[in-house]
């Protein structure tokens, strides 16, 4: 309920009570009702994200977890209910767009500026149902927070998911929170001869700060 705490309507409050009752009757231990933080941060912090996993959630920004090398995407409530009930779901395998980012961040530029620049170029529907694969020297040197920021915004260009190959900082982060060794992780990498539906290149050397504003 992290996006709606405290409940702002009677309907929301009643819905949350139904969920809490369900959690208790099903003895679900991994639940974060309130006071924990936003799920996009809490889920990886609690060690619930690993590379190579398929993760779905009832929020469009579930794609955040691609920063950790997972295929992660949001879906509707009905689809997610079926995942809960059956443990299965159906996907059309998305084509991939390679987004290579080169150059170095200057003191006035953050990963949010980079992703806003990318979205501005490709458009809000330019990557619809595609995988946005972020790579390049600028991505390789980027920390956990910056990577999460970029993958979080993949949906804003229509992408099915955003994903990055985990670097050492990400791997160490995951190992610390899951208690696993690097050798136990299923780190997925693109083949050197991988074929993409489109390739885009962004040099951030001279990039300026960006501000997003409503399109209407």
What residue ranges belong to the model's regions?
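Fe-S-dependent hydro-lyases/dehydratases of central metabolism
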Residues: 1-216
